């Protein structure tokens, strides 16, 4: 009702008990008379129209106007009243005809009484007794006490109430069935839709099952008690048990899809899309769990920096989450290029393994599931392109072409000064914010003498000239100022700051003071390692700065072009074949690249001459096969591609001749200086790295076959190179390709030239 039924009017209070003599026919007549006396344009509230009703005109038989009015008030209390009187009378007529229909079914005098639950039986039995013992208690307090007493009852006493309830419940069900037979017109069976029931989620299936089990043990439990008891159990289920319900839910969904498609064919008027039928009942976590048990591989980190962070964070559980990424970034910067390269190779290997495992996983899936997994992989790749991590941003920018991008303005002298001094100020004044730090640096710049400013202005001029000389296709942002060199104390602090922050509960000021005291009390012998690292960092800074001032090497003409389907160059001699075999089986992966090459040279010296001949024959056979495949591939090219390939080979030979000059050693030095300018390229491909190793193997192998000490030669060459094999892969590819072309003309020419190169190296040393 709308609330008015709870506040009886004076007429309702005065209703005589004799009103019971109204029959159904009399009440319908009353309503008909009222309907006939309504105004033609009845649009007012029913109370307004009711107050203007002439009840004497409504009176009929021996029912007076007042009696009719009282009866109307009684009937109108049974229906909602926020409508016009015309509408209200129609509803009242329906109520008079079927007073016990629908929700009012239980009000029928013959309707069987529902049995009390075991708890209510106990409550009704004990309430009077406890009310006498505790008259000061309210009904709420009594209910709480009796509820607690019932829970404390032994099972034997509880069983008495449970058995009485079950007996009366069976009797109630029999009486209800009899009532339905006797009064079929009163049962309002809502016409149920014949649309198939939607499939349940794994959690819903589990809850339905567990609820039945729970009610068998505690039949008197309320719905709230069942929910409270089972609510948290689903999240605590083991993966194996959760998987059981996931499989059941998937089976149910499959059945639903088949039934639903048949239903849609029979009812084409329904507007149900295919997406609505095939909608998954699994959550993201449940889907991932199923995929994991089906053998779907875990996606590896996207780049070497992410891989390093993932490994480092596993041991940083005590460090606050806000500090972890900062520490990871600092530790990453402390790694040498060789260590970063190792992580890059490891990351690339994980990606390759993932692709192989993913293909194997896809083969085991039906076509629909394959499409789903491929769709998820595609979305992940799209998201990666849209949001790049700080670690992956730099390589992607370096590897991209700059022709379509707007060139950046070179940095100013003041900016160079600020970047150089900012880190030192941050350590000395950690309480300053970024904006305060910037203002302080600006004041310091203004206070500098013109002589000191001239040094930074010279750098600015060099960077500006560099920017003007920079070609459109050159690698991105050579004019960026290199990172300032760190002092020994700064490098040490970055390596231990995590421990100090944990000790001082993330209080950075206290941690910095403690680190400063520890550093001052350290012996020189303990500081020596950090002093060496600082010296290396200073050399790195000076080298990068000199590279920025130097004009960029012209690499566009010698940049390796990729031709689809071009056969890969095989080893050119026995030593290179031997090296490739050792490198590919992973036996030496634990060694750094420099030591790895020395070890390969040493092993080559130890094997017998017959084994060397065996590797030489294998290499010669692969060279013959390569020539055949290369000829077939060149013939298969279109005329335009063939012409482009020949032009590329011709230009490459000319460029390599210019770069190498008469002395092979000087050419290698030239290439090395060029490669040093791009040593931070973290996104080089692993195949190019292998070719770089093969190039060194080739030189070492030739010298070994000529009787030279391969390991010694390799060590000397690498020590002269100076940067632990951080050669640019593209340049190494060019050397490989040049050797490859020359080898097509004469198999032994490359070997002899390499031998002469090594001999000259040895002579110069």
Curated annotation (Swiss-Prot):
Residues 112-180, 196-264, 298-362, 407-475, 482-549, 568-634 bind DNA. Residues 370-379, 457-487 have a biased composition (Basic and acidic residues). Phosphorylated and activated by PIK3CA. Pfam families: HMG_box (PF00505), HMG_box_2 (PF09011), HMG_box_5 (PF14887). Residues 664-674 have a biased composition (Polar residues). One of its GO terms (cellular component) is nucleolus. GO terms for biological process: cellular response to leukemia inhibitory factor; positive regulation of transcription by RNA polymerase I; rDNA heterochromatin formation; transcription elongation by RNA polymerase I; transcription initiation at RNA polymerase I promoter. It is found in: Nucleus, Nucleolus. Gene3D superfamilies: High mobility group box domain. The modification Phosphoserine is found at residues 273, 336, 364, 389, 412, 433, 435, 484, 495, 546, 584, 638. Residues 747-765 have a biased composition (Low complexity). Residues 677-746 have a biased composition (Acidic residues). Residues 1-21, 370-411, 456-487, 546-576, 649-765 are annotated as: Disordered. It comes from the Eukaryota. The keyword Zinc does not apply. Keywords: Acetylation, Activator, DNA-binding, Nucleus, Phosphoprotein, Repeat, Transcription, Transcription regulation. The keyword Ubl conjugation does not apply. GO terms for molecular function: chromatin binding; DNA binding. The modification N-acetylmethionine is found at residue 1. The modification Phosphothreonine is found at residue 201. Homodimer. Part of Pol I pre-initiation complex (PIC), in which Pol I core assembles with RRN3 and promoter-bound UTBF and SL1/TIF-IB complex. Interacts with TOP2A in the context of Pol I complex. Interacts with TBP. Interacts with TAF1A. Interacts with RASL11A. Binds to IRS1 and PIK3CA. Interacts with DHX33. Interacts with PHF6. Interacts with CEBPA (isoform 1 and isoform 4). Interacts with DDX11. Interacts with NOP53. Interacts with ALKBH2. Recognizes the ribosomal RNA gene promoter and activates transcription mediated by RNA polymerase I through cooperative interactions with the transcription factor SL1/TIF-IB complex. It binds specifically to the upstream control element. This is Nucleolar transcription factor 1. It comes from Mus musculus. The lineage of its organism: Eukaryota, Metazoa, Chordata, Craniata, Vertebrata. The gene is Ubtf.
């Amino acid at each position: 009702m709308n609330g008015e039924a709870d506040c009886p009017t004076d007429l309702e209070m005065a209703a005589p008990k004799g009103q019971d003599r109204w029959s159904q026919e009399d009440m319908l007549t009353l309503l008909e008379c009222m309907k006939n006396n309504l105004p033609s344009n009845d649009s007012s509230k029913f109370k307004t129209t009711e107050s203007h009703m002439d009840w004497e005109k409504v009176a009929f038989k021996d029912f007076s106007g007042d009696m009719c009015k009282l009866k109307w008030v009684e009937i109108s209390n049974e229906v909602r009243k926020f409508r016009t009187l015309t509408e209200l009378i129609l509803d009242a007529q329906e109520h008079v005809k079927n007073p016990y229909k629908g929700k009012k079914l239980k009000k029928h005098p013959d309707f069987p009484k529902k049995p009390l639950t075991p708890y209510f039986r106990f409550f009704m039995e004990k309430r009077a007794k406890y009310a006498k013992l505790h008259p000061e208690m309210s009904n709420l307090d009594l209910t709480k006490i009796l509820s607690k007493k019932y829970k404390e009852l032994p099972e034997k006493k509880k069983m008495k109430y449970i058995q009485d309830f079950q007996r009366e419940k069976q009797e109630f069900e029999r009486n209800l069935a009899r009532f339905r037979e006797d009064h079929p017109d009163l049962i309002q069976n809502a016409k149920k839709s014949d649309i198939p029931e939607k499939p349940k989620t794994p959690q819903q299936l589990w809850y339905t099952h567990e609820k039945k089990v729970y009610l068998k043990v505690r039949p008197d439990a309320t719905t709230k008690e069942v929910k409270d008891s089972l609510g948290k159990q689903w999240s605590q289920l083991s993966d194996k048990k959760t998987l059981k319900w996931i499989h059941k839910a998937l089976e149910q969904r499959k059945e639903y899809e088949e039934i639903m498609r048949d239903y849609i064919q029979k009812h084409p008027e329904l507007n149900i899309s295919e997406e609505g039928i095939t909608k998954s009942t699994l959550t993201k976590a449940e889907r991932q769990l199923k995929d994991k048990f089906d053998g779907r591989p875990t996606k590896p980190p996207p780049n070497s920096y992410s891989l390093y962070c993932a490994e480092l964070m596993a041991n940083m559980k005590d460090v606050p989450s806000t500090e972890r990424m900062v520490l990871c970034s600092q530790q990453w910067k402390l790694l040498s290029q060789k260590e970063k390269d190792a992580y890059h190779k490891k990351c690339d290997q994980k990606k390759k393994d993932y692709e192989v495992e993913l293909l194997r996983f896809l083969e085991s899936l039906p076509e629909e599931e394959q499409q789903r997994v491929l769709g998820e992989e595609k979305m992940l790749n799209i998201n990666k392109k849209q949001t790049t991590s700080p670690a992956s941003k730099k390589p992607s920018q370096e590897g991209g072409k700059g022709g379509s991008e707007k060139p950046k303005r070179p940095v100013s002298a003041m900016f160079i000064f600020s970047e150089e001094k900012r880190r030192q100020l941050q350590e000395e004044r950690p309480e300053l914010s970024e904006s305060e730090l910037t203002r302080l640096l600006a004041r310091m710049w203004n206070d500098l003498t013109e002589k000191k400013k001239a040094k930074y202005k010279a750098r600015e001029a060099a960077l500006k000239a560099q920017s003007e000389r920079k070609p459109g296709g050159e690698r991105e942002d050579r004019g960026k100022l290199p990172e300032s060199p760190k002092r020994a104390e700064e490098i040490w602090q970055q390596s231990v700051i995590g421990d100090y922050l944990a000790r001082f509960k993330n209080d950075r000021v206290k941690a910095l003071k403690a680190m400063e005291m520890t550093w001052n009390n350290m012996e020189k012998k303990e500081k020596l390692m950090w002093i060496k690292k600082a010296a290396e960092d200073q050399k790195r800074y000076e080298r990068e700065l000199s590279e920025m001032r130097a004009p960029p090497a012209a690499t566009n003409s010698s940049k390796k072009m990729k031709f689809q389907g071009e056969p890969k160059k095989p080893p050119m001699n026995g030593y290179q074949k031997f090296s490739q075999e050792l490198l590919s089986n992973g036996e030496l992966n634990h060694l750094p690249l420099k030591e790895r090459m020395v070890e390969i040279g040493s092993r080559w010296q130890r094997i017998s001459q017959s084994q060397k001949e065996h590797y030489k024959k294998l290499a010669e056979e692969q060279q013959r096969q390569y020539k055949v495949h290369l000829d077939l591939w060149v013939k298969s090219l279109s005329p335009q591609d063939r012409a482009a390939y020949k032009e590329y080979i011709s230009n490459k030979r000319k460029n390599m001749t210019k770069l190498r000059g008469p002395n092979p050693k000087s050419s290698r030095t030239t290439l090395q200086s060029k490669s040093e300018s791009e040593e931070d390229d973290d996104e080089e491909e692993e195949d190019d790295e292998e070719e770089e190793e093969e190039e060194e193997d080739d030189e070492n192998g030739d010298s070994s076959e000529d009787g030279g000490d391969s390991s010694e030669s390799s060590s000397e060459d690498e020590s002269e190179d100076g940067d632990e094999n951080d050669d640019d892969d593209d340049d190494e590819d060019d050397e490989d390709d040049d050797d490859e072309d020359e080898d097509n003309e004469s198999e032994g020419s490359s070997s002899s030239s390499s031998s002469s190169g090594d001999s000259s190296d040895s002579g110069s040393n």
